[in-house]
A protein has these predicted regions:
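Phosphate-binding loop of NTP-binding sites
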Residues: 87-148
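N-terminal leader/targeting and accessory segments in enzymes
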Residues: 1-89, 93
Length: 148
């Protein structure tokens, strides 16, 4: 995903933009938040990614999406009420940019297997570059937005 923070802010009610910046990928992993990356600081049960913001800045990330800014923070940021919700809003906005077919697989059992079968069929019919599928079992509120 590529874009600017100014483009994202419209789809994020209650958010505040500190400064605009361009980015060429979105990540929630501070270890991959390097040059050009937009880092979304998620709070988990064990770790709060807000604690890794200094590492993200040192790695050269372009900007961050956070729930709170550290004192003296200078990197461009979008401050939001909830970063997990914001990640979904970013993916939703990105998805709306493209009028391409989408296949969703739901159910209690077998989703990953069916997803892999569909991906293999599409790759055989149209080529690897013509399809996109989640890597492994990322069918959750974090994995799906990151796949888009």
């Amino acid at each position: 995903m590529r874009g600017t923070l100014a483009q994202l802010i419209a789809s994020m009610p209650g958010s505040q933009l500190t400064a605009d910046a361009s980015f060429d990928k979105v990540t929630t992993d501070s270890r991959t938040a390097n040059a050009g990356a937009l880092f979304v600081a998620l709070r988990g049960e064990i770790h709060d990614a807000h604690g890794f913001l200094a590492q993200v800045a040192a790695n050269g990330a372009a900007a961050v999406v956070v729930e709170r800014l550290p004192e003296g923070w200078t990197l461009p940021a979008i401050v939001v009420p909830n970063t997990l919700t914001a990640l979904g809003q970013i993916a939703n906005q990105w998805r709306r940019e493209y009028a391409i077919p989408l296949i969703g697989v739901t159910g209690s059992n077998g989703k990953t297997t069916v997803k892999e079968m569909i991906a293999a069929i599409l790759a055989a019919a149209f080529g690897e570059e013509a399809r996109l599928a989640t890597q492994g079992n990322l069918n959750n509120e974090i994995g799906v937005p990151l796949t888009l």
